């Protein structure tokens, strides 16, 4: 894939060599993310951060990644502050706003909306999530995290055993991650959810046609006994008809330390795309896992900055120039100290 000037809209754009290229560049970004060095390689460049759906981590992570490369960020959040409320099309919005930016990150609640926006854009557009469809940068950072966690244990992604747990129907992160995992060899995927929240059939079929083993179950304990990764997801309350309907599923697939100790292998890595619902009745990861060294959710979030830095460097064609515009850091940073 030629990254220069490219839109990043779907995981299906990538081949395995493209993934390796992104991850190699992400590895090279670590000194900058940890404030050991600073670079001005994107000095003068502008990121248009356009989020028409609530976001904290993804929006701030994109902004931080661009800032760490020396660029500037302009934010647009919510429909109420945009001309879309006046009937303006996504194409027209893109045509105008792309004149104010060098690259745009966009999140929108409608599936396919970011691709529609990209058709009108004169600059690269990166999909920050389009409704229940895809979240390609989250899938990339998830896979990057899996690679780093398994590498520390002397493993690779091939022959991975992973359980995906929770709302697999509405969770765009698991949709995109499954598509990425399809590029690797001999992956075993266990899908753990109530049947009403099951992974879409077409994703399951694509994985099986690619030669991967897919198991579908609603039993949490038996699904996590022989896995490398437990990937939990939240109930996507905003995609249900009512809060009561969403609440009916809470607590059924909650992973806590007692269940982990009883059923998981000692090195099983725990992941979650965040935000997690930490309330006692919620469906996700209990707070008593916070001291478990295999809880990777915060390392996962940190990795998002590295992967997004890599994507910006690649689509703006500066991946090989980052060090040229670097210098040592002058200020104290707790991140660097750790």
Curated annotation (Swiss-Prot):
Physiological role: Catalyzes the condensation of carbamoyl phosphate and aspartate to form carbamoyl aspartate and inorganic phosphate, the committed step in the de novo pyrimidine nucleotide biosynthesis pathway.
UniProt subunit comment: Heterododecamer (2C3:3R2) of six catalytic PyrB chains organized as two trimers (C3), and six regulatory PyrI chains organized as three dimers (R2).
Classification via PANTHER family: ASPARTATE CARBAMOYLTRANSFERASE, ORNITHINE CARBAMOYLTRANSFERASE, MITOCHONDRIAL
Species this chain originates from: Cellvibrio japonicus (strain Ueda107)
Record field: catalytic activity: carbamoyl phosphate + L-aspartate = N-carbamoyl-L-aspartate + phosphate + H(+)
Keyword field: Pyrimidine biosynthesis, Transferase
Superkingdom of origin: Bacteria
Gene3D superfamilies membership: Aspartate/ornithine carbamoyltransferase (3.40.50.1370)
The protein, known as: Aspartate carbamoyltransferase catalytic subunit
Keyword Membrane listed: no
Binding positions (carbamoyl phosphate): 57-58, 107, 135, 138, 274-275
Listed GO MF terms: amino acid binding; aspartate carbamoyltransferase activity
One GO term describing the cellular component: cytosol
Transmembrane spans: none
NCBIfam families: asp_carb_tr, PRK00856.1, PRK08192.1
């Amino acid at each position: 894939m030629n990254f220069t000037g490219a839109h990043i809209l779907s995981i299906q754009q990538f081949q395995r060599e493209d993934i390796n290229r992104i991850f190699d560049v992400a590895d090279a970004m670590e000194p900058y993310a940890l404030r050991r060095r600073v670079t001005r390689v994107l000095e003068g460049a502008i990121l248009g951060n356009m989020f028409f759906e609530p976001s904290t981590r993804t929006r701030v992570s994109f902004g931080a990644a661009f800032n760490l490369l020396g660029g500037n960020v302009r934010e647009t959040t919510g429909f109420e502050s945009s001309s879309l409320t006046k009937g303006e099309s996504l194409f027209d919005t893109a045509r105008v706003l792309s004149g104010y930016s060098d690259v745009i990150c966009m999140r929108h609640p409608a599936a396919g909306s970011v691709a529609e926006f990209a058709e009108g854009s004169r600059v690269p557009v990166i999909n920050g999530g389009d409704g229940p469809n895809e979240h390609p940068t989250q899938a990339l950072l998830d896979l990057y995290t899996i690679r780093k966690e398994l590498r520390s244990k002397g493993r690779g992604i091939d022959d991975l055993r992973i359980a995906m747990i929770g709302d697999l129907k509405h969770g765009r992160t698991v949709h995109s991650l499954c598509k990425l995992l399809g590029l690797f060899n001999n992956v075993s995927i266990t899908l753990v959810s109530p049947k009403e929240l099951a992974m879409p059939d077409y994703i399951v079929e694509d994985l099986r046609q690619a030669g991967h083993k897919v198991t579908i179950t609603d039993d949490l304990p038996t699904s996590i006994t022989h896995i490398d990764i437990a990937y939990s997801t939240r109930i996507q309350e905003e995609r249900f008809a009512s809060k009561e309907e969403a609440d009916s599923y809470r607590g059924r697939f909650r992973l806590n330390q007692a269940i982990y100790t009883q059923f998981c292998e000692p090195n099983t890595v725990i992941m979650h795309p965040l935000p997690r619902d930490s309330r006692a009745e919620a469906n996700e990861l209990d707070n008593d896992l916070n001291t478990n060294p295999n809880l990777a959710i915060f390392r996962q979030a940190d990795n998002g900055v590295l992967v997004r830095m890599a994507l910006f460097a690649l689509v703006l064609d500066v991946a090989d120039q980052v060090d040229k515009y670097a210098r040592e850091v002058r200020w104290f940073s707790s991140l660097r100290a750790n």
